[in-house]
Amino acid sequence: MPKLKTKSAVKKRFSLSSSGKLKVTQAGKRHFMRRRTKKQLRNLRGTTTLIGQDAKNIIKYLMPYGVQ
């Protein structure tokens, strides 16, 4: 049976932490920045973690070798 490929789009958008959680960059910082407050922009910096069924599905189906 051939190896399963990881989806390229998922490789670019998600990364796995050492504990197995999915790290994701915050959405909403591409355009229309003028209308947002400084506090909103500050809170959009950095990364967040995906939890729950969404994270499990991404790891299982789109990152087959993500967690061994």
UniProtKB/Swiss-Prot annotation:
One of its GO terms (molecular function) is structural constituent of ribosome. GO terms for cellular component: cytosolic large ribosomal subunit. It comes from the Bacteria. InterPro entries: Ribosomal_bL35, Ribosomal_bL35-like, Ribosomal_bL35_CS, Ribosomal_bL35_sf. One of its GO terms (biological process) is translation. Keywords: Ribonucleoprotein, Ribosomal protein. Signal peptide: none annotated. Pfam families: Ribosomal_L35p. The keyword Transit peptide does not apply. NCBIfam families: rpmI_bact. PANTHER family: 54S RIBOSOMAL PROTEIN BL35M (PTHR33343), LARGE RIBOSOMAL SUBUNIT PROTEIN BL35M (PTHR33343:SF1). HAMAP family: Ribosomal_bL35. Belongs to the bacterial ribosomal protein bL35 family. This is Large ribosomal subunit protein bL35. It comes from Orientia tsutsugamushi (strain Ikeda) (Rickettsia tsutsugamushi). The lineage of its organism: Bacteria, Pseudomonadati, Pseudomonadota, Alphaproteobacteria, Rickettsiales.
